[in-house]
């Protein structure tokens, strides 16, 4: 299983770091519009620097860590690669405000998509990530993504309609779970 991160800025880098802790760095490929940034993170984690095309062609799980306003531009040249794939893959988007259907349109097909709303505390295992899956995501793909994110902190599935409120939902869940973390069970 190979995991690719297109975009290794604050959020993409934090999730790549968590993923490396969860599954090991040897099957993680990293790319960034500034190749030096991907190279530096790859060296730090023990991962593999790559380009967007290689990640799109070779990875089973493709994390999209680019800004919402550049997502369509980034995906356009990758559409032929996605269309030509014969092996299963899942796209994982952390772009705020980009709905699953819109992302599928940008990618050029009704591909499996997991939409996530993480925070940067994911890098140290103290994050709260809400997620939602498109109908095309299989149970195995869902579990693979969750396993990759396991070291990032808490994970909570919510309806896509709530993704715009994901930060508030995450904070509420943290507050709800806080008393149980402080109160020992007898």
Per-range role (PLM):
Residues 15, 35, 44-45, 53-57, ...:
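Rossmann-like NAD(P)(H) cofactor-binding subdomain of soluble oxidoreductases
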Residues 29, 122-157, 166-172:
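Short beta-strand and adjoining strand-loop segment in the mid-core
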Residues 1-57, 126-127:
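NAD(P)+-binding Rossmann beta1-loop-alpha1 motif at the extreme N-terminus of oxidoreductases
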Residues 103-110, 154-164:
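Short, hydrophobic/aliphatic alpha-helical segments
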Residues 1, 26, 47, 89, ...:
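A structural micro-motif
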Residues 175-186:
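Single conserved hydrophobic/aromatic residue that forms the stacking wall/gate
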Residues 10, 36-37, 69-70, 98, ...:
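Short alpha-helical
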């Amino acid at each position: 299983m190979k995991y690719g991160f297109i975009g290794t800025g604050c959020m993409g880098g934090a999730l790549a770091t968590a993923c490396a802790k969860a599954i090991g760095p040897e099957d993680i490929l990293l790319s960034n519009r500034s190749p030096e940034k991907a190279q530096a993170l790859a060296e730090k984690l023990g991962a593999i620097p790559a380009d967007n095309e290689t990640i799109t062609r070779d990875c089973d799980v493709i994390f999209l860590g680019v800004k919402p306003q550049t997502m369509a531009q980034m995906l356009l040249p990758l559409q032929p690669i996605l269309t030509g794939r014969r092996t299963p893959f899942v796209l994982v988007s952390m772009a705020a405000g980009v709905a699953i259907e819109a992302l599928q349109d940008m990618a050029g097909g009704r591909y499996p998509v997991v939409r996530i709303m993480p925070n940067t505390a994911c890098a140290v295992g103290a994050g709260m990530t809400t997620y939602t899956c498109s109908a095309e995501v299989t149970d195995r793909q869902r579990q693979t993504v969750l396993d990759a994110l396991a070291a990032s902190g808490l994970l909570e599935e919510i309806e896509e309609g709530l993704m715009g409120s994901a930060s508030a939902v995450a904070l509420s869940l943290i507050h709800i779970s806080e008393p149980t973390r402080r109160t020992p069970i007898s």
